[in-house]
């Protein structure tokens, strides 16, 4: 179930302040954030945002097709190492 249209998209205020400061600055640097729940706005395009995945900050370069999605969608929290190998060969 999506968010109600009358509420509008959500962005943490502290993240929005950092993005606005970055857009106005000449030099672009990585913005660190723990806000995985924030929606990507059009003014985020071209910025690199380091999103926390529970262990480290994953750098996410924001492109136009990411607008409207959440930041957490681009920083996976679980590492898949594959299923255990079949031990039938070693048992012989």
Curated annotation (Swiss-Prot):
GO molecular function annotations of the record: rRNA binding; structural constituent of ribosome
UniProt keyword Transmembrane helix present: no
Domain of life of the native organism: Bacteria
Pfam families: Ribosomal_S19 (PF00203)
A single BP term in Gene Ontology: ribosomal small subunit assembly
Swiss-Prot/TrEMBL keywords: Ribonucleoprotein, Ribosomal protein, RNA-binding, rRNA-binding
This protein's record includes keyword Membrane: no
Gene3D superfamilies named in the record: 30s Ribosomal Protein S19, Chain A
InterPro entries tied to this protein: Ribosomal_uS19, Ribosomal_uS19_bac-type, Ribosomal_uS19_CS, Ribosomal_uS19_SF
Gene Ontology annotations for the cellular component aspect, listed alphabetically: cytoplasm; small ribosomal subunit
Protein purpose: Protein S19 forms a complex with S13 that binds strongly to the 16S ribosomal RNA.
Family: Belongs to the universal ribosomal protein uS19 family.
UniProt name for this protein: Small ribosomal subunit protein uS19
